[in-house]
Amino acid sequence: MSLPNPAELLPRMASDLRAHLAERGIERPRFVGIHTGGIWVAEALLRELGNQEPLGTLDVSFYRDDFTQNGLHPQVRPSALPFEIDGQHLVLVDDVLMSGRTIRAALNELFDYGRPASVTLVCLLDLNARELPIRPDVVGQTLSLGRDERVKLVGPAPLALERKVLSSAS
């Protein structure tokens, strides 16, 4: 199975997001991208939507429930939210939804900043491997991979997807 081209998914995602927000009466949501791929996808969506609002960024490294097992990522970046969270409608963007743990960590961090009116979840890919009850409101494509396979977004320009096969320890 070949991987989709993100540039082909983004226009439909923008259209689906526009419809989703209109259905809920949300006119000026604030966008938040999760480092690093979620930021790239959020930037591309903002361009597709013609939205000039500032983009918030989250690095959820300290909020992950597995960092004591895996250690911190060597490039922890500060989160930057150039707007108030309280009462805002947020669009949270990630590149690949797998277990749901990154999204859980992002929600925990967002709520440390304030109480949003709503959070709409947008993911480029959904790998159908969730361990938590988290589901995207807008998704580019759903894929099923083998247990030893992963997908990574590379970018920022052009955006592309790479498949990785995990090596098994003997």
Swiss-Prot record:
One family from Pfam that matches here is Pribosyltran
Q: Glycosyltransferase: is it a keyword of this entry?
A: yes
Keywords annotated in UniProt: Glycosyltransferase, Transcription, Transcription regulation, Transferase
Q: Which InterPro entries match?
A: PRibTrfase_dom (IPR000836), PRTase-like (IPR029057), PyrR (IPR023050), PyrR_bifunctional (IPR050137)
Source domain of life is Bacteria
Q: EC number(s)?
A: 2.4.2.9
Chain sites annotated for binding substrate: 36-37, 77, 94-102, 151
Short motif (PRPP-binding): ranges: 90-102
Family, per entry: Belongs to the purine/pyrimidine phosphoribosyltransferase family. PyrR subfamily.
UniProt function note: Regulates the transcription of the pyrimidine nucleotide (pyr) operon in response to exogenous pyrimidines.
The record, for PANTHER family, names: BIFUNCTIONAL PROTEIN PYRR
**Name this protein carries in UniProt:** Bifunctional protein PyrR
State the organism's lineage. Answer: Bacteria, Pseudomonadati, Pseudomonadota, Gammaproteobacteria, Pseudomonadales
This protein's encoding gene: pyrR
